Amino acid sequence: IILLVSLLCLIGIYAYAKNWEKISEAAEDEKNKPLQAHYSIPMLSHETLPLLKYAEEGDALIEVPLLSQKDSGYKTGCELVSAAMVLQYYGETITPQQLYEAIDKVDTPVNADGIGVSPHKYFIGNPEKSNGYGCYAEPLINAINKLLQRERYAVNIKDTDLATIERTYLAQDTPVILWATIQMKPPKEGNRWTLEDGTQFQWLAGEHCLVLVGADEDYYYFNDPDYGDGVIGYEKELVQQRYDELGRQAIVISR
């Protein structure tokens, strides 16, 4: 009887351990879901995205080379791919890989001492991995300017409203690197960490970087590195909302 009870206990412990392993794996997957923010193979349609429009022949668009994250191998490197598109528009041969080499970067958002870093200073994570983060405008500007070596230079036009961007830049055939969200869906609360100055930072899952290449009365048009099959447009009001939520961040290259 004692042996039977012991055997049943061992079986129970093993079953519990296996079940806990499955629970832990599921929890880890769920934890990472909000962070897989940059890369997908979008099934873009008017049924799933009623505010989307495909660019048509005759639309007034800046002809920026279209690159994709998939082809670049950068699942979470939308910022790098978007910047490369704009640089190639100006005749530069700079690649997303060169931009990643040049950018200030860290592997994880929090170091061994528990101190976090800001995406305003660093590219966070590995762009080849689906659980990477990315960066905001400032480190991308620094990387671009390292590579351009003053022949041209990146300019931070943060807080410029979209109507002004349309009049000032698009009208002069100047494409704009712009922060919004994937497929213009609402951002979600991502991981939170403490910065060196003691302030709390929260990553917005769904953060995305695109190239603004045109506008009409109702839509803004983008080269979207997450979608490599053509220029797509989103309703202006929706783009404005996502642009605001991501801190009204935008970059242009001086001519």
Question: Which residues make up each language-model segment?
Answer:
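Short, solvent-exposed, low-complexity loop/linker segments
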Residues: 168-176, 180-188
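Loop/turn elements at helix/coil->beta-strand transitions in domains of secreted/extracellular proteins
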Residues: 149-153, 171-177, 216-219
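Surface-exposed ligand/attachment interfaces on beta-rich extracellular proteins
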Residues: 161-168
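A structural motif
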Residues: 135-148, 178-180
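Active-site-adjacent structural segments surrounding the nucleophilic cysteine of cysteine proteases
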Residues: 2-139, 182, 190-193, 200-203
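Soluble periplasmic/extracytoplasmic beta-strand elements of cell-envelope proteins
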Residues: 86, 177-179, 211, 221
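Noncatalytic regulatory segments and standalone regulatory/sensor domains
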Residues: 192-204, 210-255
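A mature extracytoplasmic/lumenal domain signature
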Residues: 82, 159-161, 180-184, 214-216, ...
